[in-house]
């Protein structure tokens, strides 16, 4: 009987796993598009299917009341062994209640080192101190820097503004303790990818009001999310079905973070969540006329205004806060920001965020170094150490970031 029960259990698990895999692969080929401009398209297909497979399993566990889907996906992602470097000392610490990883070169330094505050990406729902460990190791070793990676709390368990608050608290703690970690207060950089770029941007903007703290020397924004207001720009239309960040996944993350009902998807997609007078207030910064024409060549049509759904607007209007959408911060704040390095990717749903923020910064006299990855897609840097599933684009981004940081 025991053997029979085990056989049935193993068989059920095998059928479940195979069925899930076939569903994910079929859905990928039916709904997602890999442009010719992306090198190694099959690597991206495999990564996309693996991610959606973990989320599919997670959704099943969520329906059973066992955990949230992103929690299960994060659990599986964190099973990947951590890379280590004999030249870098890594410590797991807490800044108050916030977990952080501290990376410091083993070789002693006669002078205070440059400091990097790193915020990982993951759409506010996944990503961790472990998933971005290799990036932080390289930054510490190759820039001879002290790196603090912030383990902020994530959605859907923790809604806005918890992530923002955690990042600001951790940054403030570090800036108040630079001498403890051997960091030069005149050389502190913030850095982040995706929503980590959001955190780096928001933190830098909020620190403008803190003259009592050391001033941030530079910020590095890697395909950042910078506004949650307009979802009809050229990159949203061109890259809507391109992994690793499709429109469906982006809106799911949006709803998890801001506690918005996912039933508003079609309303938001068609721009019916925003009253015309509100759009006019921010159009000077978000309008497609601010985007160079060459980025509209793959297709763009202006979305005509439809009837506004006031219920959707009332639920979503919290995104008009600059801590959600730092692209709409006032000139008096943006003009005081430090030198900025921005990395954008052609096949990224959020590409235009980088283009619009670059223009805002430059218009206000803030020095900007911009790198555009013609073969890049959202999330490519997170696959930096994935071996056969990594991309040359990720290595180029890493090299450019290191080159920028070494200036300071």
Swiss-Prot record:
Listed name of the protein: Arylacetamide deacetylase-like 3
Gene assigned in the entry: Aadacl3
GO cellular component entries: membrane
Similarity comment: family membership: Belongs to the 'GDXG' lipolytic enzyme family.
Active site: 194, 348, 378
The keyword Hydrolase belongs to this UniProt entry's keyword annotation: yes
Broad class of where this protein is predominantly found: membrane
InterPro entries, sorted: AB_hydrolase_3, AB_hydrolase_fold, Arylacetamide_deacetylase, GDXG_lipolytic_enzyme
């Amino acid at each position: 009987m025991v053997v029979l029960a085990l056989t049935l259990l193993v068989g059920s698990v095998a059928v479940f796993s195979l069925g899930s895999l076939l569903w994910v692969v079929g859905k990928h080929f039916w709904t997602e598009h890999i442009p010719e401009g992306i090198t190694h398209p099959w690597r991206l297909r495999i990564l996309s299917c693996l991610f959606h497979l973990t989320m599919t399993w997670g959704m099943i566990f969520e329906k059973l009341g066992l955990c949230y889907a992103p929690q299960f996906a994060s659990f599986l992602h964190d099973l990947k062994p951590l890379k280590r470097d004999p030249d870098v000392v890594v410590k797991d610490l807490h800044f108050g209640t916030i977990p952080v990883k501290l990376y410091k070169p083993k070789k002693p330094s006669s002078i205070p080192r440059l400091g990097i505050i790193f915020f990982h990406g993951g759409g506010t729902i996944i990503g961790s101190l472990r998933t971005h460990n290799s990036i932080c190791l390289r930054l510490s070793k190759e820039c001879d820097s002290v790196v603090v990676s912030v383990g902020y709390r994530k959605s859907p368990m923790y809604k806005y503004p918890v992530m923002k608050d955690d990042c600001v608290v951790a940054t403030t703690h570090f800036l108040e303790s630079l001498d403890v970690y051997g960091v030069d207060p005149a050389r502190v950089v913030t850095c982040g990818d995706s929503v980590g770029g959001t955190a780096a941007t928001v933190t830098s903007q909020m620190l403008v009001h803190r003259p009592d703290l050391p001033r941030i020397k530079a910020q590095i924004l890697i395909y950042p999310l910078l506004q949650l207001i307009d979802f009809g720009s050229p990159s949203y239309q061109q890259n809507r079905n391109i992994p690793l960040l499709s429109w469906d996944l982006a809106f799911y993350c949006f709803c998890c973070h801001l506690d918005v009902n996912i039933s508003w998807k079609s309303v938001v997609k068609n721009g019916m969540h925003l009253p015309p007078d509100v759009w006019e207030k921010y159009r000077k910064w978000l309008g497609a006329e601010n985007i160079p024409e060459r980025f509209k060549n793959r297709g763009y049509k202006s979305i005509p205004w439809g009837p506004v759904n006031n219920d959707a607007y009332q639920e979503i209007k919290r995104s008009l806060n600059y801590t959600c959408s730092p692209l709409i911060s006032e000139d008096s704040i943006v003009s005081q920001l430090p030198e900025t390095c921005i990395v954008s990717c052609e096949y990224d749903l959020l590409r235009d965020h980088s283009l619009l923020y670059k223009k805002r910064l430059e218009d206000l006299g803030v020095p900007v170094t911009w790198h555009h990855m013609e073969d890049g897609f959202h999330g490519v840097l997170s696959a930096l150490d994935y071996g056969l599933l990594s991309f040359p684009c990720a290595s180029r981004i890493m090299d450019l970031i290191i080159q920028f940081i070494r200036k300071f």
